[in-house]
């Protein structure tokens, strides 16, 4: 048998400042209007994210219920992030206090992956696969936008002033002086995805590190 190969050389880079941002809506390309919510599969999308938007016309403090959420949702009201829900913990509702109507409700849902075995393989559509309730009232009149975030879509984004507090795209530039394997430390972030020079590096949560495969020169 051949000898075990030597470890790849490693390198490092300085802290990257992400001072440029693009709004989530910059990646919107094909929005579908529907009376009821639609799943990713209904729109011919297999992976990524899907954005739902509708209007709440009844003020008050009550539960927003997302039936059959798959898999992770960020909820915004009038452009402000107010809650998140995670299917892994059987979370499907949150209490909101709506003072002013009409209020714009946005739900950004992430497809976190699929199973390929067991009985759940038959019930594995992604997005919101049933309905959304505001109290006992079914919400209708949805604008639905799939966000598969293909390479060309991400690479063509126009960046500007920094955006904080809501889902968005952020960009920074760094230089690798010496080729080698390295890590992108996202421990101070929440949840999202990383691209290097337009190539998808992977998704992250705040407890994970992602390996960057020997980037060279100036990257963003």
What are these regions (language model features)?
Residues 210-219:
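Single conserved hydrophobic/aromatic residue that forms the stacking wall/gate
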Residues 1-125, 130-133, 138-141, 152-157:
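Carbohydrate-binding surfaces of carbohydrate-active enzymes
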Residues 55-57, 95-97, 173-175, 185, ...:
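Generic structural detector for well-ordered beta-strands
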Residues 47-55, 165-174:
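Short beta-strands within extracellular/lumenal beta-sheet-rich domains
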Residues 134-136, 140-172, 180-185, 190:
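C-terminal beta-rich recognition modules with glycine/proline-rich loops and embedded aromatic residues
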Residues 62-76, 105, 174-197, 204, ...:
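Aromatic-lined ligand-binding clefts that engage carbohydrates, nucleic acids, or primary amines
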């Amino acid at each position: 048998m051949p000898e075990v190969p030597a470890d790849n050389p490693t390198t490092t880079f300085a802290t990257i400042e992400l001072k440029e941002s693009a709004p989530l809506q910059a990646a919107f390309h094909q929005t579908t209007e529907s009376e009821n919510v639609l799943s990713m599969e209904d729109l011919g999308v297999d992976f990524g994210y899907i954005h739902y938007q509708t209007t709440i016309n009844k003020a008050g403090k009550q539960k927003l219920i997302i039936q059959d959420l798959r898999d992770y949702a960020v909820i915004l009201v009038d452009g402000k992030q107010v809650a998140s829900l995670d299917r892994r913990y059987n979370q499907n509702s949150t209490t909101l206090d709506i003072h002013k109507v009409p209020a714009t409700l946005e739900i950004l849902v992430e497809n976190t992956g699929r199973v390929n075995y067991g009985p759940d393989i038959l019930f594995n559509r992604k997005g919101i696969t049933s309905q959304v309730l505001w109290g006992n009232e079914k919400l209708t009149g949805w604008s639905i936008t799939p966000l598969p975030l293909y390479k060309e879509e991400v690479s063509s984004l126009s960046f500007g002033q920094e955006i904080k507090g809501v889902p968005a795209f952020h960009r920074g530039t760094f230089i690798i002086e010496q080729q080698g394997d390295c890590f992108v430390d996202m421990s101070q972030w929440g949840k999202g995805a990383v691209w290097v020079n337009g190539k998808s590096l992977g998704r992250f949560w705040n407890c994970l590190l992602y390996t960057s495969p020997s980037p060279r020169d100036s990257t963003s």
